Structures are given as structure tokens and as C-alpha cells.
UniProtKB/Swiss-Prot annotation:
Free-text function comment from the UniProt entry: Potential calcium-dependent cell-adhesion protein. May be involved in the establishment and maintenance of specific neuronal connections in the brain.
KW Zinc (keyword) present: no
Segments of skewed composition (Basic and acidic residues): 922-936
Name of this protein: Protocadherin alpha-C1
GO annotation (BP), single: cell adhesion
Glycosylation sites: 38, 248, 274, 562
SUPFAM superfamilies according to UniProt: Cadherin-like
TM region positions: 684-704
Region (4 X 4 AA repeats of P-X-X-P): 812-907
Species the sequence originates in: Pan troglodytes (Chimpanzee)
Extracellular topological segments: 19-683
InterPro entries: Cadherin-like_dom, Cadherin-like_sf, Cadherin_C, Cadherin_CBD, Cadherin_CS, Cadherin_N, Protocadherin/Cadherin-CA
Signal peptide: 1-18
Amino acid sequence: MVGWGVAVLCLWVSCGAAAGQLEYSVPEETERGVAVGNLSADLRLPAAAMSSRNFRFLSSHRELYFGVDLPSGNLVVREPADREQLCRAKAACVLTYDLVLEDPLELHKIRIHVLDTNDNSPLFPAGDVQLHIPEFLTPGARFALPNAQDDDEGSNGILSYSLSPSQHFRLDMGSRVDGSEYPELVLEKALDREQRATHLLVLTARDGGLPARSGDAQVTIIVVDTNDNAPVFERSVYRTKVPETAPNGTVLFRVQALDPDEGSNGEVQYSLSNSTQAELRHRFHVHPKSGEVQVAASLGPPETLLEAYIEARDEGVFGLASTAKLLVEVTDVNDHAPELDFLTLSNPVPEDAAPGTVIALFSVKDEDLDSNGRVICGMSSAGPFQLTASFDNYYSLLIDGPLDREQISEYQVLITASDSGSPPLSTRRTITVSVADVNDNTPSFPQPQQELFIAENNGPGASLGRVFAQDPDLGKNGLVSYELLDVISEGPSASSLVAVESSSGAITAKTSFDFEQLRGFHFQVEGRDGGIPPRSATVTINLFVVDRNDNYPVILFPLPRNCSVPVEIVPRSARTGHLVTKVVAEDADSGSNAWLSYHISRASDSSLFRISANIGELRTARLVLPTDAVKQRVVVVVRDHGDPPLSSSVTLGVLLSNSVPQLLPDFEDVWEPGGQLSAQNLYLVIALACISFLFLGCLLFFVCTKLHQSPGCCAQSCCRSTEDLRYGRKMVSNPCMTSATIDVTTVERLSQTYLYRASLGLGSDNNSLLLRGEYNAADLRNLATGVGLNLPISCIQIRNRKGDHANVNAMPRQPNPDWRYSASLRAGMHSSVHLEEAGILRAGPGGPDQQWPTVSSATPEPEAGEVSPPVGAGVNSNSWTFKYGPGNPKQSGPGELPDKFIIPGSPAIISIRQEPANSQIDKSDFITFGKKEETKKKKKKKKGNKTQEKKEKGNSTTDNSDQ
């Protein structure tokens, strides 16, 4: 609002003795602080006096719109006053206040008139107006419109109404009973909803203020529809083509009829008209809402024209309808694929069939017409085939090139027949052409030569390898059999050495190969197929024998002479590195199996000597000291590098002397300085003594039990048969002969075995000697007599390799009392070649292997080759035994005697062999030469030689552990 200025109109002032009344006027919405009038002047009272007289300004209104400014005495506006809020629906708006003054008391009434201003525009309380007028009304129809309201009074109120221009409506004013007016809408022209469904008008109300204010209301006139229009199709005739194979549900048309009416008057439903023939009504289906015409049944043969009528009707109260014509032309489609009919088919086809050979003959046909029935045939194949047209709709499949079953054994021929329709239809047929085999391929080996390797000492039947020839032919034409062909010009034939399995080609050995005798040979194997005629090929087999470590090193130098230890003399003044001797050895094996190294395994003084590991030179490792013993003993082991390694040893005696003695001393007792046993040997002697005493106790108990059960038996009736598992021979043993036995065995070098077993019965004059071997009767008789056995003739039996038995008369003979072990014999018994980590002993080169006995401290039960020495040999039989460890000794050649054995009264050496671990020969026997009386005599000498026997026991134990 615009401020009017401060205009105070004093209408009148009524002064009385006690009260007065003042009136003021102010326009509404006057701003704060504006002076309405000067109370001080109107009351004729100074402004300062008002304050001194306790001036008070009272009002009955909640809000104080006016107040008194004491310094100036003016009546001012505190809050703008809105007349429409303070005095709604009142012609005059007056605010009354009370002014109280004291001393003297005075009361004044103040009336303030709030004057109206044109600050409000006309307003339609209902807002926009919406009228529904049916289109069928005639002009002149009247429709009341709402009044507008204006809060202002007097000329600021509403004075007039106006309507926006329209060709269908005009505005008119109606009057009420109270004289008030209201606007009316009058229809000037008939309405058509299909042309214009909605009319928008603006009703405006204006007041009389300065400046004038106005308010608008939008009048929306909606024309209400009536069913005055029938549906109209887009086209009067619908024409289409449909294939004869159209399935049910195929949409032929989508017709549409338009109805400009609204609502249900304009909703159209479709159906077949009654004008359609009854026989066609079941072939079509019309959707009532969408107007789709679908196929409901078969339309009949091609080239048929079907005519039907469709009706569109609205849903008004009085439904209006219209019709359209449907023309459906049934057309032919390519709905038949070509058919193939095979008249002949040759399968399989031989791979040598000539080009031009007919494989198949077939015909094609198509039930469709015109281009849909024209058929074109084609072929797709990677093979040598050709498709040709014989005559109308007949085709032949021919061979167009060579066939090879080994490259391709089967062909897949794809024949395609296509018509000329749109789209074309085709039929495919795959023919499998198998190629029959003919024998046109020769067996072939992967290589013309093949190398095979076999380790020596193989067993007969060992697999050497396998040959394999490939033949791509089929069946018997590709079945290869193998045959051995001899091509060895010298030596044994290949057929005597190897065999070839005809079906698998496996090559096996017929014999055991020895690398040292046969290092390799070659032969041929022929592979032949089973075709007609057969084809064959050969392969050369080069067989190599691989060496095994089966030969022990053989010491060539130094060699024991006369069964004594070889002795070397070293001056005491020898310097360090003095050459004592050189050990020379050889090995029949090859490669690393023959690579020898030399080591000192034992020495009387290990610090005095050293040996070259490669060349075997034994040298002094330091200067000879005066305290060094004169007699030194060194055991040199020669070991190869096989897997496992084999070794041999030689015992050397070294005499530390500046002069050459006339008689060499005995080195048998030289092992430890000062003649003392090492702690290890001492433990071994104690263990052997305990075991020996335990064994003797068990043996005595067993003998007593046997004597108690069998007081006597004859030599022949008490014999029983046992089996020698190693050699497969039977021998006869007498259970009564448990007191003493001697077993002397030489293991075969190739296949010969010699076993001598003698048994002497306890407490009986009838003794038996059971020997096995290939000796004549005289030799066996001499042997039995020589060993001092008193045997009856009836108990001497001989069994040769053929299994024949014979009895030999044996004359008893006493042993030679002069036969003793000499010092050289004892020394020779300690010079041996042994297998590493075993107790098998061998002789020097060129001679058969031997197993030398060692001396133990007691006479335990013999185990695996332990035997007692002969009585009268110079050693008490109850104090030591010959003993050697287990092993696999080499075997003697056929016809060979045991290497060495002792005959009483002769310097020869007995070679005592170990029986195999699994041998069933009774191991509980031990050797006693002579009679019991001689044994008793020897026992008397035991006490006198007690000190010497202990020394021999210690040396024997030391030798045994070394061996």
C-alpha cells in the first residue's frame, strides 16, 4: 500500500469537567510510527504534563495498534491494521481506546476510524468451473456461473463480470430475490462433440477501486457424446493371399472400423456377417476386439479364392453397424522336400576297384508343382567319387579314382537333392562306403637294425626284447608272424642261443650268456603276414651281452709259496716312502667292474705302511722305529668298483731287518704288538667261548637222549634219506652216527658236485662211511682208510649222478701218527682271497677256489661249514674247530676233484667248503679222525699245553674276524 501522509482530521472535541471524546481516522495498512493526531494539542495539555499526571492508554483489543509518543504528545501507529481482518463484513471499522489522566482524574474516549483501501482483488471461491453439456442441446440453454468475492467495501467492491469471446456461448447476468446479481452462461450455437469435445472460456470479475482490480476463473465446457455415428471401415474390400499350408491361427487380416463417438458409443466389435457362406464360416475366426481374421481350418486346395464378409458394430444403446468384404486367395507353397530312393548300393568296395565302377543307383522325386518340383542333385565327399545323371530323375554314384584302404578305410558320401522352390527344400542322405582290404602292403619294421642288451649270467628263458613289424593291412593280411633266421657264420647258431615267439615277436634267451666268452652276436628275424600271397620283411638284431660284476679280483703278485705267507724284508734304515712290494691284480670283468683299487684292511701297525689306491704299491708311511716289532703282517684288499663290489685279499709278511735270515719266521701269530689281543677280538673270543660251551651242553644232552632211546642199530637199518636242496641229490645218513662227521664239498663250477660225508658211530664197532662223487671204488676205499675211519664194508654206499648205488669194501686203517700241521701249512691257511663282507675264501689265480679254515676257541655246534679237525693233527680236538662264514663259493669244473685236502701222513691241504644256507645236510656233525682211545690220549696233553692253546685260540679268532 502507498502511504497517504499524515492527515489528522479532528472532527470535534467535547470537553467536559470529567470526560471528553476524541475521534481520528487513519487508512488501513498505515506503516508503524506514522502520527495519527496530536493528543497534547487536542487535550490542551502540555506533553510534559501528561507524563507527570500518570498518563495511561487503555484498549480492549488483544493487539495495541496505536500508542502515544510522550515526548511529542502524538498518537502514532504501532502495528499496521488490516480492515478486512478487524472488521470483516462491517460497513464501518472503528477502534476505541481510553485515555486516563490523574491529578486531577480525567477520562477521555478516543475513537479511531480505520478507512478501507482497494487492497483486495475479486476472487472466485470455487476456483475453475467445469460444465458438462450434451451435444444434442439446442441454442438458448442457460447455465449459472459462480459469483466472485471482494473483501473491500463500497466502490472498492465488485462492479462487473465479463466472458472471453466464443461462438457457441455468451455471458448474461441474472438477479436474485434480494436484488443481487450473478453471471449466467447462455448457449448461442449447437455443439458437436465429434468436432470439438471441449470448450475453454475465461470469466473475469472487476471492482471499482482506483486503480481497479480483477479476478479470473476458467470455465471448461465438456461436450457430452451421443451415439450419433456408425463405425466406418478403412477399406470396403480386404484382399490377401495365404499359403495352402497356413496353420490354424495364422492372421490373414487386421481390419479396423472407426467410430467417432465416445465411450461405449465408440467401442466397436467385429464378427463375420450373416452374408458369409456357411461352409466358409468355420474356416475363419474373427477376434471381436482386435479385428484380426485368423485361419481356423484348412483353406482347401491351391488356387482357390474365398469370399467372406465382416461386420463392425458399436456398443451404443442403439448399436450402429457397417460391413466390409474379405477376399482370400489360397496359393501353392513348396511344402514337399525331394525324396531319394536307392535302387542299388554296393558296399564294401574293394580297394583295387577300377575307376568307373558303379557304387549306387538312385532316383529323386518331388510332389510339388512347377519350380517347386524341379530337383537338382549334388554330392559332397573327400573321396574319389563322381555323381552323374543317368536319365530323367535317375543318378549314379561312380568311383572316379584309386582307393587305398590303408589311408582311408571308410568314406562318408553326402548326397543332396534340392528343389527350385522359394525357399528351396532339400533332402540329404549320407552313404557310408567301406573299402575292403587286399594284401598290398609288406610288413615293415621301425628300423632295419635293432640293438638289444642282456646282462650276463641270465637264466634260460630271460626276455631279451621284442620285435614288432607293422602291416597296415586288415585281418590276416595284417597279421604278422615272426621267425628266427640264422646268420652267424662262426660259433653256435642263433637258434641255439635265442628264440623268437612267432605271434608276439618276443625274443628270449635259450641259455645263459657269459660276457667273458661271448660279448655279442647278430641274427635276423623275419616278419611275414598271412595274406595270399604272403609278404615278408626282415630286421637285423644286434645282441650285446652286458658285463656283470661276477668275477673277483685275482691277485697275481705276490703269491704264497708252499702255503706260506709271502714275506718281504724291509731294512730298518728305510726312509719314508720305501717301496715294500707292489700288489698286482687283475679282474676278468670289464669297465668299472674291472677297475681295481687297493686298500690296507689290517696291519700289525697301521701307521707303518700305506698303499697306493690305484697302482697297489705298498710303501712305508714313516721311519722304522726301534720299538717296531720285527715281524709285521699286512692284509691288502683289492676291490673292484662293481655293484656290489667284489674284493680279494692277500696277507703279506714284512720282516724289519737289516739282514736276510736263513729261515723265515712264522707270521701267523703276528697281528697285535706285544702279542696282546685287541678289545674287539677279546669280545669275540668271549662270545665264541660262551656259544661253544652252550652248544656242547646241548650236544651232550642230544647224544644222551639218542643213546637212551636207541641202544643200538645196524648201519643199514638205521639209515634215512634226506634231500640236498641245492644239488637235488639224496644221501643216506645214519642217526646213530652222531659223534663225529666230516663233510668235504666242492661247489660246481658248471654243474658237477662232490660231497663226501663220513659218520662214526658212538660206542659201536660197526661204523659207516657215506660218500658222494664220481670216484672209483679204490679211491673211495683209500680215502676212507686214509682218514682213519673203521667202517664195515656193508655201510659204504656210492651214488653217482645217474642215481645208481654201489657198495665198496673199505678196509679200516689207522691214521699216521706222524701227521701234523706244519708252520708253513698254518701260514698258508691264512693266505687267502675273500669276498668282501663275507667269509668265502678263494685261492690264487689259476687254481680252484678254496675256503681256508680258521681256529676258534671252543668246539661249538658246527654251523654252515664248521668242521672239527682230524684227531692227531697236532691240536686238541676239543679246543678248536675249522670255521668259515656263509657265501656263494664258485664251483669246480666237471670231473675236477676238490682243490686240496689233507691225507694223514701227507703234507696236502684239506679244502673244506661251506654248504649252502638252505642245504638239508645235517650240520650237527663234526670231524674226528681215529678211535676214542686216541682221543683220550690227546686230552691228557691239553693241560700241559694250556698256555699255548690260549694263544692259538686268540690268533684263530683274529684270523676268523679278518676273513
